[in-house]
Amino acid sequence: MGDWSFLGRLLENAQEHSTVIGKVWLTVLFIFRILVLGAAAEEVWGDEQSDFTCNTQQPGCENVCYDKAFPISHIRFWVLQIIFVSTPTLIYLGHVLHIVRMEEKRKEKEEELKKRGSVKDNNYPGAATSGGGSGGGNNFKDPPIKMGKEKLPIRDERGRIRMGGALLRTYIFNIIFKTLFEVGFIVGQYFLYGFELKPVYQCSRPPCPHTVDCFISRPTEKTIFIIFMLVVASVSLLLNMLEIYHLGWKKLKQGMTSQYSLEMPVTTLTPVMVTGESKPVSLPPPAPPVVVTTTAPAPVLPDTRAVTPLLAPVTMAPYYAAAAPRTRPPSNTASMASYPVAPPVPENRHRAVTPTPVSTPVTIPTPIPTPTPAIINYFNSKSNALAAEQNWVNMAAEQQGKAPSSSAGSSTPSSVRHPLPEQEEPLEQLLPLPAGPPITTTNSGSSTSLSGASGSKWDVEGEEELAEERPISATCTTVEMHEPPLLVDTRRLSRASKSSSSRARSDDLAV
């Protein structure tokens, strides 16, 4: 049994570097073959020759019949079977141990090279000229050989050597030869003994005088052992076939895919290098859009907010509300009488008339805001002052009726007339509105129609009034009247106009 233990230790080392099916096969070999053969079979087959008897007294006839019945003992036959079947596994184990030893040597040499390399780095300038430099050169020639050998088996994360290359081929040959040995020993057992032992064996080999009967001890027990060992051999054969399928197809496909994957990085490295070189070319395009987005949207927003109110009066038709008129502060523009045709339009009015470009989001008109209570109260207070002024104008009209009508056609000094009112709100400067028709008024004595020059003045003032009254829903119509030159006190008129803070003059009437 000492020899069996030595074989068991060797097979245990091989089990560490085997597949799952290979480990199962080794377990079957250990338990159902070696242990059973060493524990029970020798005792059962121990009296094989001593208890073999024949019914003859002829010397030598019994030995000749035993040799014919059992050309080789079953115990020895099974021992040979175990040895032959285990031999391919032992060869594979030897290959693994060789690889392990080569790896250990490689590591030792690499450590030596690292130590020598560190020493050469410290005294590199003198090492190139000294004799030790040649030795260092030889050391530098070793790493390429070692790098080539590192491509052979490599240990996995569990510390086992991976099957690949020559090691994988060795393992496949190991399985194939084990299968062949199993089949050969099963067939040999069938031809040598068969699968059953009969209690009586007839022998007619000389020197026996005639056919003699020989008797075998414990034939039934021996038959059971034969069948048991045959079943174990069949199980081992089945495991070998499964392992051939597992390695012959799966592992070979893995080897092909692994070789293909090892070759692919070499081909894929060139596109990676190309993309790496093209990165500086592709980086500049994203920069210009960033500059455009930061500068473009900033000026658009204030323009839309400033221009949006311009569209409000355009979307709706002009209308006149019957609300109290609003007074205007005095302005410094020239009177209408000093111009033959029409007063000059201020520069800011021309700016309002010119169309201003509006961006796309401004096309939607905004609703006209309703007047607030503060604005309504303001105009109510102004209406009271205007009513007092109208009373004064009525008195002036009565006095004008008493004067001769010829004086009405006299030219009035330009200083009496008020210039064009100054615009209060910036919206009035920007909104050009359609001119209203000429307005006529009838006095108590005579009716006067507005001249062409005054009509143009009314057109301008009508536009200004519409632009002024549109957002607050209130209009103010001004009628020009002529005063008598002698009956009206200019001081009184100027004081009244200043106290009421209105734009009306002695020759104007607000209706």
Swiss-Prot record:
Mode of membrane association: Multi-pass membrane protein
* Region named Disordered: 110-143, 397-511
User: What family is this protein classified in?
Assistant: Belongs to the connexin family.
Q: Which GO terms describe its molecular function?
A: gap junction channel activity; gap junction hemi-channel activity
Q: Where in the cell is it found?
A: Cell membrane; Cell junction, Gap junction
- Its recorded name reads Gap junction alpha-3 protein
Cysteine disulfide partners in this protein: 54-214, 61-208, 65-203
Q: Which residues lie on this side of the membrane: Extracellular?
A: 41-71, 196-223
Q: Which domain of life is it from?
A: Eukaryota
Subunit structure, as described in the record: A hemichannel or connexon is composed of a hexamer of connexins. A functional gap junction is formed by the apposition of two hemichannels. During early stages of lens development, interacts with the C-terminus of MIP.
Q: Which Pfam families match?
A: Connexin
Q: Which gene encodes it?
A: GJA3
Explain the purpose of this protein: Structural component of lens fiber gap junctions. Gap junctions are dodecameric channels that connect the cytoplasm of adjoining cells. They are formed by the docking of two hexameric hemichannels, one from each cell membrane. Small molecules and ions diffuse from one cell to a neighboring cell via the central pore.
Q: Compositional bias of type Low complexity: which residue ranges?
A: 403-415, 440-456
Where is it expressed, tissue-wise?
Detected in eye lens.
Q: Which residues lie within the membrane without crossing it?
A: 2-15
Family annotation (InterPro entries): Connexin (IPR000500), Connexin_C (IPR034634), Connexin_CCC (IPR019570), Connexin_CS (IPR017990), Connexin_N (IPR013092), Connexin_N_sf (IPR038359)
Under the heading PROSITE patterns, the entry gives:
CONNEXINS_1 (PS00407), CONNEXINS_2 (PS00408)
**Entry GO terms, CC:** connexin complex; plasma membrane
Q: Can you tell me where the transmembrane regions are?
A: 20-40, 72-92, 175-195, 224-244
Give start-end positions of Gly residues composition bias. Answer: 129-138
Q: Per UniProt, which keywords does this protein have? A: Cell junction, Cell membrane, Disulfide bond, Gap junction, Membrane, Transmembrane, Transmembrane helix
The residues on the Cytoplasmic side of the membrane are 16-19, 93-174, 245-511
- Principal location: membrane
